[in-house]
Amino acid sequence: IVTLDEIASQLEVSNTPVREAFQQLIYEGFLAQQRNRRVEVLSIGPKFIRDHFEARAIMEKSCAALACKRATEEDFKEMKRINEKSIKAMQKGDMTVYTRCNYDLHHAIWTAAGNDKLIKMLSDMWNGLAVERLITVEEYAQIAQLSFDEHQEILRLIFARDAKQAETAMECHIMRSCENMLEYQKGQKQKSEQN
């Protein structure tokens, strides 16, 4: 449990930016508000992870289906541009660039869906919990190839305007990411128990 004043003092900033950060972290489920301006740091357990990815899967599969119906030629060009960049990143083994392409590609699909509310909610969720920020580069490289392959299939289906199959492929992609995160967390827990 920490207080707003303690954190502001440690960071040598006013309370305002810390309060705003706390509010965002409370909204995202990382902190819980206590009495007397105190907050409790919540652990990220399996339920939190599953809830996060299930919500993302529901929204992202809808975006994939909507993108099949609403995507313009400009949207397709943007997705192809990002995909080409991700292909080059994978060939070079550049996980930093691939990570950015991963986000950019998902965002391009959300944009092609044409629903501003979904874009906002998914952007907020993406910034809250991302597998690649919690694992090493080597570990991410192992799952990046699978992610890349899934992206190729999702794009193929969106370009073919096959809404039903694109929706299914996106849901599988997101839930596979969930399983990766749960496996990683389980492994981390086992490592800490051995030490």
Segments and roles (model prediction):
Residues 24, 28-29, 47, 51, ...:
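Alpha-helical structural segments
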Residues 44-50, 64-72, 89-93, 134-141:
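A ubiquitous short alpha-helical element
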Residues 61, 80-87, 92, 104, ...:
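C-terminal all-alpha effector/ligand-binding and dimerization domain
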Residues 47-50, 118-125:
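Short, charge-rich, low-complexity alpha-helical interaction segments
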Residues 1-65, 69, 178, 182-195:
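Short linear motifs at protein or domain termini
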Residues 96-100, 120, 145:
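Amphipathic alpha-helical packing segments from all-alpha helical-bundle domains
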Residues 100-103, 112-119:
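Amphipathic alpha-helical effector-binding/dimerization core
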